[in-house]
Every structure is written in structure tokens, then in C-alpha cells.
Amino acid sequence: INNALKQGCRIFYTTPLKALSNQKFYDFCEQYGADKVGLLTGDTSINRGAQIVIMTTEVFRNMLYGTNFGAVADNLKDVRYVVLDEVHYMNDEQRGTVWEESIIYCPTNIQIIALSATVANCDELTNWINTVHSKTKLVNTDFRPVPLRFFYFDSSQPYKLLPLLTPDGKLNNKIKPEKPQWARGKDKRKKTYVKQIIQNLADNDMLPAIYFTFSRK
């Protein structure tokens, strides 16, 4: 984005979700100034001629539908970069073709920056983009803006959260396997500690949080 602004050209930033596009729009307006940022979704059009335009990937793909293969239409004039955020959506059964077509039909003079934190076959994807679009380089990083920290909830009283790993990356030896909570002929449902876990999170200033469970029961 900074390169586009310095070069005086335009950049499209695509996302798979309207909500994510809206969030990026507000973030970029705050960072770069509202006069430099536009938004295009299915039902919203704001400053569409801006240097930085955020849109859903479907909107970008539909722009390409109206041009000859490899050509640059008026709506792509001065566009030098296209960011495809969450490019792993290419594996989605219903919507994956949107990302494929966006890459295939994108003019080769436009540089594609494909972003994802979850693509497993990144080398294969790089080679494919290199074949159907233009020369492509894979850039890997293990940097996380928000570092992951793992904890284990000790259900023996007093209830507490224990670091899963030691500072050198080894399993915390204070964590012991839980004993089975049921015996033959008794209720086999495992006791849950939702309230105790949330209380521990609150006590350690770790809220808000998302509590994920595999069952509604």
C-alpha cells in the first residue's frame, strides 16, 4: 500500500467478506486518510476512484468479466497492485472459483499479492500463479502480531490455569493426566468447568474470550 501511494498508482484490496471489507475500510481511513480510501461491496460504493479501494473478491472478479482476457479496462486504470486477502478461500467448494478466476483473468501487468495464514500447499499455489498469471515469489514468515500462548486448565482444586509449555518450549511437568471421572455403570458424561474457566480468565485479565465447544450438550 505504501508503495502504491509513493508511486502515485492505485491498489485494490480484496477480502472474502463484506464485514471484513468494512473493517479494513475504517482501519485504512484512519491510517491513510479518508480521501485516499474507497469501498466497493454488493450494496456500497464509497470513493470508488480512490488510490486504495477495498472490495469483496466477487466485486473484483466481476470487474474482470467486463474486460477482454488480459486487457485493462477503465475500472482497472492506474491499478498496479491487487491484494487477495484470505486466498485460502480458493479451496471453498462454493466460492473457490472466484479466487481462481480473479488470478487467471487479472492483467499480467498488475502485481498480485496473495495473503493467507492457513495455506498448506503454498509452494504448489505459488507455482500455479506463476503459470497462469506472472512470475511469483513465495514469502514465508512465522511472525505473529499477536503471539499465541497456550494454557491448561487444572480441574483439581484450587482451579487454576497452567502454562502448557515452559519458556524453552517443553511440556510443563506440573501438568498431570486427569483421572477418569466415570466407572462402569455410572454416567459417562465428562464434567465441565465452564464457570471456573471463565472465572480464571477474568482473574488473569484475559477477557474477552471465545469459548469453543465441539457439542451443544
Model-flagged regions — what are they?
Residues Y26-E30, T67-A71, G96-E100, N127-N130, ...:
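Short, glycine/charged-enriched secondary-structure capping and boundary segments
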Residues D27, V59, V98-E101, Y193-I197:
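Well-ordered alpha-helical segments embedded in enzymatic catalytic cores
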Residues C9-I11, K36, G49-V53, D78-Y81, ...:
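Loop/turn-to-beta-strand initiation segments
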Residues L17, M55-V59, E86, S116-V119, ...:
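A short beta-strand-to-loop transition that corresponds to the Sensor-1 phosphate-sensing loop
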Residues C9-Y65, N127-N130, K137:
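Conserved nucleic-acid-binding Ia/Ib motif block in the N-terminal RecA-like helicase ATPase lobe
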Residues V53, T57-R61, N68-A114:
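SF2 helicase catalytic motif II
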Residues I104, Q111-I113, T118-K217:
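Conserved interdomain linker/interface between the two RecA-like ATPase lobes of SF2 helicase motors
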Residues I1-C9, D27-C29, E100-C106:
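Walker A/P-loop NTP-binding motif
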